[in-house]
């Protein structure tokens, strides 16, 4: 189930109604999710489900599903299974014969893409690049991609990532999106080289979305 990526008003009526009716909510971070649930007076039982406890939690959630009860899966922000372990839970639900139903809503991937000004006809979502092993190879595989490439990145690695993309892919149109849908939303458009110059003197906080275009002279920002 999708939840807001920043602005708490970006949740659907259907999502609120479903969260109130299910037997259990599996949340990536219960502390952050409780803020959303409190806003909409949702008192459903909630447990944590994240990368480091997913295998233990799968067993507990499986028991709930086998009792013919519904479980809602939510992430910190946006759509589950996009760069988080909800994929494993979806697979397990399918294996035990439960119906899997997506309740759509906010997604940082699509919000950043449509507001970036880069081509939207084809895109590749890379998520977070590996911190070390396989990182360079993963970028090299994108050299000939005829699509907009979308990355998630932590602020403390953003400069390094932009620099490495510039070194391997060459200079291309690129965009940084941060704080999407929030009060201080910021979208910085330019090229990999111009973004690198900005990052030499500016530090962002939190997670950012980084978009890189194919190398096409018609796409560059003026």
Kindly label every feature range from the protein language model.
Residues 1-51:
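Glycine-rich, flexible N-terminal cofactor/catalytic loop recognition
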Residues 5-6, 76-80, 155-157, 215-217:
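Short glycine-rich anion-binding loops that position phosphate/pyrophosphate groups of nucleotides
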Residues 19-25, 98-100, 148-149:
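Short active-site oxyanion
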Residues 49-55, 128-130:
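Conserved helicase motor
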Residues 50, 58-107:
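Glycine/small-residue-rich loop that forms an oxyanion/phosphate-binding "nest" at active or ligand-binding sites
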Residues 69-70, 148, 152-222:
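A contiguous loop/helix-start segment that scaffolds small-molecule binding in enzyme catalytic cores
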Residues 88-145:
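Class I SAM-dependent methyltransferase SAM-binding "motif I" and its flanking Rossmann-like core
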């Amino acid at each position: 189930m999708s939840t807001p990526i920043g602005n708490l008003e970006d949740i659907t009526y259907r999502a609120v109604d479903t969260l109130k009716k299910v037997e259990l909510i599996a949340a990536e971070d219960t502390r952050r999710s409780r803020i959303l649930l409190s806003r909409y007076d949702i008192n459903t039982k909630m447990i944590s489900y994240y990368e480091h406890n997913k295998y233990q939690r799968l067993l507990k959630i499986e028991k709930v599903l086998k009792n013919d009860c519904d479980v809602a899966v939510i992430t910190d922000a946006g759509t589950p299974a996009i760069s988080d372990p909800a994929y494993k839970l979806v697979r397990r639900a399918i294996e035990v014969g439960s119906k899997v139903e997506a309740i759509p809503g906010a997604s940082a991937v699509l919000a950043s893409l449509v507001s970036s000004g880069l081509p939207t006809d084809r895109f590749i979502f890379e998520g977070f690049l590996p911190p070390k092993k396989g990182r360079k190879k993963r970028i090299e595989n994108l050299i000939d991609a005829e699509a907009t490439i979308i990355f998630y990145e932590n602020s403390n690695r953003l400069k390094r990532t932009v620099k490495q993309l510039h070194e391997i892919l060459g200079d291309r149109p690129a965009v940084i999106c941060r704080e999407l849908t929030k009060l201080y939303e910021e979208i910085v458009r330019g090229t990999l080289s111009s973004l690198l110059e900005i990052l030499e003197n500016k530090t962002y906080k939190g997670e950012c979305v980084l978009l890189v275009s194919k190398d096409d002279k018609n796409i560059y920002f003026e």
